[in-house]
């Protein structure tokens, strides 16, 4: 039996002189410090044989204190490297058991200015104490990086004083190098949003605060126990943000990159990272104020992604985590003023929901995730097997990829969490609503047109900012005037300003839902320098099919002799009939 494609409408998205901005080029390339295909060995040697007791004591009494060591990688030895222990529960739990496998903070630049390790001044080695698989943080990064600036990670073998300490997760530091890479500058205000409290507080210090962005008054010292300032100054900047959130002193979009925040919240929910602001516990994020005056939310510490050790509180009632409300925090009683503000704003709520749909559709393919995990575990299995300091067995190393288990605590499985969470989210009454469909984005001279189905409003979101932010809304019309050829034909038009370096995306809404093109906007967007006629078609065989929808926008299986919409990962849509 033969059948063929009848392509009714090929939907181009790129033009001569126009591209989709691709932020993935910012991330580490093959051979870099975070090369996922490499399992390197790092050797640390301290001159002081009593190094461990010194570092444990300073962890409690002077957490920023470092001692010198040499570090060797790939046969090259670096002198006077500053080392300290880091972490909280991941330090306390092994340390309380006299297990030497604690996390490390390594500063190459501490005593020797300009010294770097494969281009990085600082690295952080996490011990995966709550992750039997060793791959949850790495797998989470592979998803987060598609939607907002995120730290990188891979695995390394660590030797201390010549002895194999174990398999570690090498994680990128959120510092000036990170902000320079992602925001092209490094002088802005930076906060690590984690309370000063300690999981194992043997020193009797006061409990830390909660970085929930609640307004505590004008006195900035009231915020010291909840936020850790990493830049030279910035408390007044943070207070201005908190006042905007809680008191409405200035519009929130004038001081916060709202879209980045919505992306962070969306990915948190889809991958069940509940150890952060819009989850169970309010911490594990950074705030950086870039030159456009907007605070950027940066995710951090993803070892409890796919529920992770959060499962311990709900192991015998897993619906609590698998069916965690993605809009939790909209109620003032929850005490999360930022989610309360954003989730009760109709447009921001729709945009957040659209982002969750995108992450679900693009990033929860268990076959792809399992393949990447198998690759990393195959590379590191011997290193894990010979790690006598790890907290789990090799049987759990493999089995926790597929399913949760109970040991001394409960630990969420990667695939079981994805399957349960995906099923819940796709059936959620708000997420399952039908959004508009956007296709055929086209520029001819100064006229931008796009085909949109099932929309009540279509907007051009445009900016010329060098910081790729502060997109402004311009209504697109289907009224037969102002450049629109025919009214009510589903083709929306707008006249573009006659200027170069325009960055834009399309935002369409109906009464229920929202759709963006490209779907990863505002992290990705269309850009062009000169307007050069009709857009050209993309190379089809380089695209990945994301889903197939019927004429009502509902995801369906491919069928014969019916109108179908094929939606690709580059934002393009093809309307097809497969004739049998």
Where are these regions (language model features)?
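Internal "kinase-insert"/substrate-recognition segments embedded within catalytic cores
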Residues: 103-113, 120-122, 127-128, 134, ...
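C-terminal tail/sorting-segment detector
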Residues: 563-580
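Middle-to-C-terminal accessory/interaction subdomains
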Residues: 19-23, 31-33, 37-39, 50, ...
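Residue-level detector of functionally pivotal "anchor" positions at catalytic/ligand-binding pockets or at interdomain
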Residues: 427-437, 529-555
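Conserved NTP-binding catalytic cores of kinases and kinase-like/nucleotidyltransferase enzymes
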Residues: 18-134, 139
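Exposed beta-strand face motif in extracellular beta-rich ectodomains
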Residues: 67, 500-504, 562
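Glycan-association/targeting regions that enable binding to alpha-glucans and other polysaccharides
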Residues: 424-531
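Bacterial Sec-dependent N-terminal signal peptides
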Residues: 1-19
